[in-house]
């Protein structure tokens, strides 16, 4: 329990009393319609300009504050591309700091997706031509600047990439962007009295008490009755989310960060590490309001108690309230997914590695990040088995490659179907085994990175570098 001053105690007691006296319907009415990031649909070879520059937003109503963003708004527009296409991309840095960018989940060489060594100085630009050769998935792009990524992401340099292919477009899935195919970028924040973001760079980790989705707090979204698809990106610096629905119905997992499953898998909850993405379906045919939450469902007593808490819990754990409307949908049968290539999962292991992570000591295999050191070299096309343990619960991620989760704590996963990932949550002192596939090259000048997905710890050195050669 925190130590409160008399004034703080009186203020919070008054707020708690108001919470108990206010009808629940009043709280719901105070939620605002969800903001949907604008979308850039990329045709074949169409130029796309992403202007990193200062912007303004209101985290607290009526308090306009300075932030960073892309193309003039807080956060970034969604970029939607097609598989087997290419993108002429231009980043323009109109910020006062050097920035490097990464498209996490996009499988391509570092000269296309970016590297921590591909610096974009202030008032400069970079124009890679990116070839897209992978199945449909949800990626995200974000600042990946050495020693400064957490601050820059927190300020607003983050957005979603969507890759589509012909099979996913033909599948029986909700696909109307912003209508029944909803992008959700999750962030936890801390604000001062003026509504300005607060971040202490000296903290080991960052846990804000307030939850924002697409840059907005306490949002709802009206949808037609039937199935709705949620594309969820954890853009928080340190916080994992335990996704579930408040009415205990399942979330139907259809995709992880680098591809779709063979069929929807109903799950009671899904743990989402920083930088991790999932796609889920929610059934809303009954017409009742359903909330996507993190953690357990809370009642008014819990919310009042949380006002006096000094832990890392969110003040409001409702991510998004879904409000179905209209008649029951004709599209009421469970959606189907695109054809599944089982041969992609027949893997031959070329090598094994063991990674022991001590994130709070900023160490991986007793080594702290050194930008001049390459930790290992992988042959392009190889598959490796990685045994990973961490002495603290933390996310793990890598760039430019993908993996299957083979075991957790030496137990085979109960999932019905395999799925490709680039990020995974590690429980404390539990071994996770990954089968990692390396299909794209990275040079010693522009290496790929691996390490914790907690951006605060990553900036402090809990990461490494590898190259992929022919």
Swiss-Prot record:
Gene Ontology BP annotations: FtsZ-dependent cytokinesis
Task: Read off the Pfam families from this record.
Answer: Cu-oxidase_2, Cu-oxidase_3
Question: Any signal peptide, and if so, which residues?
Answer: 1-28
List GO terms (cellular component aspect).
Answer: cell division site; outer membrane-bounded periplasmic space
Where does the record say this protein resides? Periplasm
Keyword Cell cycle, does the record have it? yes
The UniProt keywords, alphabetically, are: Cell cycle, Cell division, Periplasm, Signal
Q: Name one GO molecular function term.
A: oxidoreductase activity
Give the residue spans that cross the bilayer.
Answer: none
Instruction: Tell whether NAD is among the UniProt keywords.
Output: no
User: What modifications does the entry list under PTM / processing?
Assistant: Predicted to be exported by the Tat system. The position of the signal peptide cleavage has not been experimentally proven.
What is the role of this chain?
Cell division protein that is required for growth during stress conditions. May be involved in protecting or stabilizing the divisomal assembly under conditions of stress.
The UniProt family comment states: Belongs to the FtsP family.
Annotated HAMAP family: FtsP
Q: What is this protein called?
A: Cell division protein FtsP
List the taxonomic lineage. Bacteria, Pseudomonadati, Pseudomonadota, Gammaproteobacteria, Pasteurellales
């Amino acid at each position: 329990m925190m130590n409160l001053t008399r004034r703080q105690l009186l203020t919070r007691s008054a707020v708690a009393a108001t919470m108990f006296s206010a009808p629940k319907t009043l709280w719901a009415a105070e939620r605002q319609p969800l903001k949907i990031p604008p979308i850039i649909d990329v045709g074949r070879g169409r130029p796309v300009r992403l202007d990193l520059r200062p912007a303004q937003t209101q985290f607290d109503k009526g308090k306009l504050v300075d932030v960073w963003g892309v193309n003039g708004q807080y956060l970034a527009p969604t970029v939607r591309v097609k598989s087997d296409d290419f993108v002429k991309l231009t980043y323009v840095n109109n910020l006062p700091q050097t920035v490097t960018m990464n498209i996490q989940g996009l499988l391509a060489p570092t000269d296309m997706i970016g590297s921590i060594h591909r610096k974009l100085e202030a008032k400069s630009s970079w124009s890679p031509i990116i070839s897209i050769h992978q199945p449909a998935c949800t990626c995200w792009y974000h600042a990946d600047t050495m020693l400064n990524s957490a601050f820059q992401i927190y300020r607003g340099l983050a957005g979603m990439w969507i890759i589509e292919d012909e099979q996913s477009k033909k599948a029986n899935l909700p696909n109307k962007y912003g209508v029944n195919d909803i992008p959700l970028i999750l962030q936890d924040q801390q604000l001062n009295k003026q509504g300005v973001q607060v971040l202490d760079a000296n903290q080991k980790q960052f846990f804000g008490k307030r939850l924002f989705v697409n840059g907005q707090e306490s949002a709802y979204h009206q949808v037609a009755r039937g199935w709705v698809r949620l594309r969820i990106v954890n853009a928080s610096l340190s916080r994992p989310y335990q996704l579930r629905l408040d009415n205990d119905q399942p979330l139907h997992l259809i995709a992880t960060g680098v591809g779709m499953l063979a069929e929807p898998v109903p799950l009671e909850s899904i743990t989402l590490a920083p930088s991790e993405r999932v796609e889920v379906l929610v059934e809303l045919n009954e017409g009742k309001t359903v909330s996507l939450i993190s953690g357990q469902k809370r009642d008014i007593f819990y919310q009042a108690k949380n006002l006096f808490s000094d832990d890392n819990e969110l003040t409001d754990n409702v991510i998004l309230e879904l409000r179905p409307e209209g008649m029951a949908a004709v599209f009421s049968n469970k959606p189907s997914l695109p054809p599944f290539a089982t041969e992609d999962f027949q893997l031959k292991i070329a090598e094994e590695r063991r990674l022991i992570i001590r994130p709070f000591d900023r160490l991986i295999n007793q080594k702290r990040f050194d930008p001049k050191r390459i930790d290992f070299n992988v042959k392009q096309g190889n598959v490796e088995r990685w045994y990973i343990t961490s002495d603290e619960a933390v996310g793990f991620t890598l760039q430019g490659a993908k993996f299957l989760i083979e075991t957790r704590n030496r137990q085979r996963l109960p999932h019905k179907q395999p799925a490709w990932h680039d990020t995974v949550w590690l429980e404390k002192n539990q071994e996770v085994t990954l089968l990692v596939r390396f299909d794209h090259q990275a040079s010693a000048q522009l290496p790929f990175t691996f390490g914790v997905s907690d951006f605060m710890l990553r900036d402090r050195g809990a990461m490494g570098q590898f190259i992929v050669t022919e």
